[in-house]
Amino acid sequence: MLGQLQDAGNTTTISNYLNLLDECGLLASLSKYAGDEARTRASVPKFQVYNSALMNAYNPLRFKAARTDTKEWGRLFESAVGAHLVNGADKGNYEVFYWREGNEEVDYIIKKDGKLVAIEVKSGRRSTNSGLSRFRETF
């Protein structure tokens, strides 16, 4: 991540801005779950809004149009689940991560008391969970 931030400008400034957005309850920065602290810290973050209404306020699609667009609806649904998870992390005393390896991913990884729960969000009936299988094999 630092390499990407250096290309964008001062890493300390960007890091401070991201921290301020997190402290204000606007944007959480989820680390990639990697199994060890060094690889987790070096990962590119996945950004998650604390309130999905902020995302929807700037969405040009109205509810009915978004609901019929399966890709857009899936994105909104995943964001709503993520918002719920990051908002509950402090009270639930857990950490929220994501995981991705190549084309396989798991939307959210919950870590509490050394135990992991992998969550793949699907808004429709069709489901491919190769990411869950790969995550289970790896960790």
Go through the PLM ranges and name each one:
Residues 114-126:
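Active-site ExK catalytic segment of metal-dependent nucleases
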Residues 1-116:
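Accessory nucleic acid-recognition modules appended to NTPase machines
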Residues 123-139:
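Catalytic cores of nucleic-acid endonucleases
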